[in-house]
């Protein structure tokens, strides 16, 4: 079994574009279709696998700790036709049960890390939804603090897992709709049965998003909202960030050695000893 390497850095990202502009950062999803973590599937329509989320998690942590000057983060798509189609179905169908379980756990932890950066580090996330935003894509958007939907007749939000796959959303979709956004339970249940999702005014009326903006005003509205939110942040903008140095480690058999700790895996006991 190949070892999944969680070490990355912005200059090595294949799926995200990270830009910094004073107090505002932008994370734009631009998935490389041929950049799957494993062979056998294509990451179409800005869908994601574990490799995409490893980069997202790295970016969230770096923005939080390396960049105290950043008070607002715009989460958007670099693809004009789609925001995010969610978890890649080809990847899921080709993966073992264990990989799918760990994939879902990691993606959940990444979204929780985003929310934690907002709750405890004063870094507000704005999701600028500029295309169809489905399944795990909308679940990622729901982790943000403020959702802005492009009102162009094509951009939409949806949780189509039930009508398309006969499974419940697996990355907090229903929970965040009801508990975080206070969407009525009957509406949340109905929304999950609508394959095409909802657009424009209806999405706003149901509190699925916070704002809708026409294409003619899109760029200006996103920049203005991000600037307003960044101006209210209490982050210590003049402080020095905590630089993430490369995490070096060696692997020999079932032993992993880092500079300050070691880990020995016992596969028979399904245990890991860390010292």
Outline where the language-model segments fall.
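Short acidic/His/Gly/Ser-rich catalytic and metal-binding motifs that mark active-site loops
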Residues: 28, 34-38, 82-86, 158, ...
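Generic, ordered loop/turn and secondary-structure boundary motif
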Residues: 14, 46-49, 84, 90-93, ...
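Short, glycine/charged-enriched secondary-structure capping and boundary segments
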Residues: 42, 88-91, 140-143
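A generic structural signal for short coil/turn motifs at secondary-structure boundaries
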Residues: 36-38, 93, 100
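A structural preference for short, pocket-lining loop segments at secondary-structure junctions
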Residues: 22-29, 49-98, 108-128, 150-154, ...
């Amino acid at each position: 079994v190949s070892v999944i390497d969680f070490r990355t850095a912005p200059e090595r990202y294949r799926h995200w574009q990270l830009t910094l502009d004073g107090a505002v950062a932008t994370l734009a999803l631009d998935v490389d279709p041929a950049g799957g973590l494993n062979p056998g599937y294509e990451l179409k329509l800005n869908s994601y696998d574990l490799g995409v989320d490893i980069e997202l998690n790295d970016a969230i942590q770096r923005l939080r700790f390396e960049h105290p000057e950043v008070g607002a983060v715009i989460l958007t798509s670099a693809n004009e036709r789609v925001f995010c189609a969610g978890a890649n179905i080809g990847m899921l169908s080709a993966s073992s049960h264990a990989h799918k379980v760990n994939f879902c756990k990691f993606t959940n932890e990444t979204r929780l890390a985003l929310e934690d950066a907002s709750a405890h580090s004063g870094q507000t996330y704005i999701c600028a939804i500029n295309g169809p935003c489905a399944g795990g894509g909308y679940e990622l958007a729901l982790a943000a603090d403020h959702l802005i939907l492009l009102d162009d007749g094509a951009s939409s939000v949806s949780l189509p897992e039930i009508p398309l796959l006969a499974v419940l959303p697996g990355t907090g979709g229903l929970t965040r709709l009801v508990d975080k956004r206070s969407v009525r339970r009957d509406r949340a249940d109905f929304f999950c049965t609508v394959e095409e999702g909802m657009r424009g005014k209806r999405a706003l009326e149901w509190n699925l998003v916070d704002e809708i903006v026409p294409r003619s005003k899109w760029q200006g509205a996103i920049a203005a909202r991000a600037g307003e939110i960044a101006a209210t942040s209490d982050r210590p903008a003049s402080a020095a960030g905590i630089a993430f140095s490369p995490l070096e480690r060696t692997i020999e058999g079932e032993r992993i050695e880092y500079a300050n700790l070691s880990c020995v895996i016992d596969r028979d006991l399904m245990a890991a000893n860390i010292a």
